[in-house]
Swiss-Prot record:
GO terms for cellular component: mitochondrial matrix; mitochondrion. SUPFAM superfamilies: 2Fe-2S ferredoxin-like. [2Fe-2S] cluster binds at C115, C121, C124, C161. Residues 78-180 form the 2Fe-2S ferredoxin-type domain. One of its GO terms (biological process) is electron transport chain. Binds 1 [2Fe-2S] cluster. It comes from Xenopus laevis. This is Ferredoxin-2, mitochondrial. InterPro entries: 2Fe-2S_ferredoxin-like_sf, 2Fe-2S_ferredoxin-type, Adrenodoxin-like, Adrenodoxin_Fe-S_BS, Beta-grasp_dom_sf.
Amino acid sequence: MAVFLLKRGVWASLMIGGFGPRAVLFSKLGQNHARLSQATPEKLETSNEEEGSSSAQITAGVESDAENQRAELSEETVEVVFLDRSGQRIPVKGKVGESVLCLAHRYNIELEGACESSLACSTCHVYVNTEYFHKLPEPDEREDDMLDMAPLLQENSRLGCQIILTKQLNGAEFTLPKITRNFYVDGHVPKPH
């Protein structure tokens, strides 16, 4: 069970499907639209806060994005190569529909992904080889905003969480930058996803 406190300007939906219920937050402007189906929250409470703003609390079972993505993966595979920070080439096989970030985690490649694919950091920043860079869809405004915060930004920079493997990416190379930027509280040790 997970509890989310929602402020004004944001609404939530509980989705049924895949591995089970999933709570999803959507902005009022609809930036994160898609996949609305059979929304039935287990518990919804509203209250007024100071200054007239309202909040809602939803309690629901939540599945991780990684679990949800596994349900949507194709059996078709593509071969790609990661170049780690030391320059070592790491050839891997990924499933069509899998993100580059999830693929890196599956093979224990040090691509952090601190925000768990929520477009709130740039720790999964990668360089895409130019032959394949133009085969990717254009980044949306939110990805561009996060890339602006990435150190060592290049023309071929993308976020690994936003690159979804397709058959056209067979043979692509993803190079990890020498550094990434993340903010931690003293003593924090990142956990693998």
